[in-house]
Amino acid sequence: GARAEVSADQVATVMWDYFSQLSSNAKEAVEHLQKSELTQQLNALFQDKLGEVNTYAGDLQKKLVPFATELHERLAKDSKKLKEEIRKELEEVRARLLPHANEVSQKIGENVRELQQRLEPYTDQLRTQVNTQTEQLRRQLTPYAQRMERVLRENADSLQTSLRPHADQLKAKIDQNVEELKGRLTPYADEFKVKIDQTVEELRRSLAPYAQDAQEKLNHQLEGLAFQMKKNAEELKARISASAEELRQRLAPLAEDMRGNLRGNTEGLQKSLAELGGHLDRHVEEFRLRVEPYGENFNKALVQQMEQLRQKLGPHAGDVEGHLSFLEKDLRDKVNSFFSTFKEKESQDNTLSLPEPEQQQEQQQEQEQQQEQQEEQQQQEQQQEQEQQQEQVQMLAPLES
C-alpha cells in the first residue's frame, strides 16, 4: 500500500508558524528560541501523520530535527540582516521607478484588473461546483434516509437484518461522495497558480522599461509577490480539503448512530430515522455556505497583495515589513531541498540494501538465472561435442570403405 508520509510543506509550515509566533518581526527570535519546543512540534507532526513510526520515517525524523533546529537558528540570525537588504533593494528599485511613478502605478493597476478578469471565470466555476457538488451529495444521501424509513415500516420484525446493509451503504456513500467533492474542488487552486504566474510575468515585462539597471532587484521583489500569492492558492486548497473532511466527520456519525440504534427499540430508531434526512441536509448546507465564498475571498487577497506591491514601489511607501515573505520562501526552499536530497539518498540506499524478504527473493532469482545459464551452456557444449563426433565419423567413413 501507499506509505503515509510527512511532506516538506508540512514541516516548513510547522517551522514557519513557530518562527512567526516568537515575534511578529522575528527580532527576538534568537533570544526566545527553544530548541526543545521546536523539536517537540516536529515530533508531534510525525506522530500525528504516521502514528507508528516506520524505518523510513524514523530515519527522516532523526536527520530532520537537527537540520530544522540549525536552519531555525540561522533564520533568526539572518532576519535582521535580510530586513536591511530588502529595505535597500526596495529603495533602489523605488529610486529607479520614481521618475515614472504615475506610469508604474497605472501598469500595476492594469495588471490588477487583468488578474481579476483572469480569475473571475475560475471563481465562478468554483462557486458553481460547490453548489453542484453539495446538491449532488444531498441527492445521493437523502434516498438512503427515505429507504431506511420505508424498510422500518415494512420490516418491523427483522430490523437488524433489513436495515444494516442500508446503514453500511450510507457510510460508504458518505466517504465516496466526500472524496469526489474534494477531487472536484481542490484542482481549482492549481489553476489559480498558473494564472498567478502569467500575471506576475506580464507585470515584470510591463515594468521592465522603467526599472533600467535595477531589473534584477525588481525581479526579486516580483518573486516575493508570486510566492505570497501562490501561498494563498495552497491555503485555499488546504481550506477546501479541511472543510470537506469536517463535513465527513459530521456525516459519518449519523450512519454510525443508525447502526448503533439497530440494537435499540423500534421507537428510538424511528425517531433517529425521521431526523436523519434533516441532519444530512443541515450539514451539507452548512458546508456549502462555508465554502462558497472561498474563491471570492481568495481573489480579494490577491488583489490586496498587488495593491501592497504598488504601495511598496510608490513614492510614499513608508516602512513595510517586506522581508518576512522572503525569509519564509528561503525556509521552504531549504526544507524542500533537504527532502529531495534525503529521498534521493534513500532510493540509492534501497537499491543497495533491500529488506530481507526482497533481498532473499532477489538472490533466489539471481541463482535461478545463473542455473539456467549454466544448463544452457552445458546443452550448447553437449551439442558441440555431438557435432564434432558426427564430423569425425563422416571423415573416417571413406577410409573404412
From Swiss-Prot:
GO terms for molecular function: cholesterol transfer activity; phosphatidylcholine-sterol O-acyltransferase activator activity; phospholipid binding. Residues 358-392 have a biased composition (Low complexity). Gene3D superfamilies: Apolipoprotein (1.20.120.20). Synthesized primarily in the intestine and secreted in plasma. Phosphorylation sites are present in the extracellular medium. Residues 343-401 are annotated as: Disordered. GO terms for cellular component: chylomicron; extracellular vesicle; high-density lipoprotein particle; low-density lipoprotein particle; very-low-density lipoprotein particle. It is found in: Secreted. Its main location: secreted. InterPro entries: ApoA_E (IPR000074), Apolipoprotein_A1/A4/E (IPR050163). Residues 1-4 form the signal peptide. One of its GO terms (biological process) is phospholipid efflux. Residues 17-314 are annotated as: 13 X 22 AA approximate tandem repeats. Sequence repeats lie at residues 17-38, 44-65, 66-87, 99-120, 121-142, 143-164, 165-186, 187-208, 209-230, 231-252, 253-270, 271-292, 293-314. Keywords: Chylomicron, HDL, Lipid transport, Phosphoprotein, Repeat, Secreted, Signal, Transport. It holds the Pfam family Apolipoprotein. Belongs to the apolipoprotein A1/A4/E family. Nine of the thirteen 22-amino acid tandem repeats (each 22-mer is actually a tandem array of two, A and B, related 11-mers) occurring in this sequence are predicted to be highly alpha-helical, and many of these helices are amphipathic. They may therefore serve as lipid-binding domains with lecithin:cholesterol acyltransferase (LCAT) activating abilities. May have a role in chylomicrons and VLDL secretion and catabolism. Required for efficient activation of lipoprotein lipase by ApoC-II; potent activator of LCAT. Apoa-IV is a major component of HDL and chylomicrons. Homodimer. This is Apolipoprotein A-IV. It comes from Papio anubis.
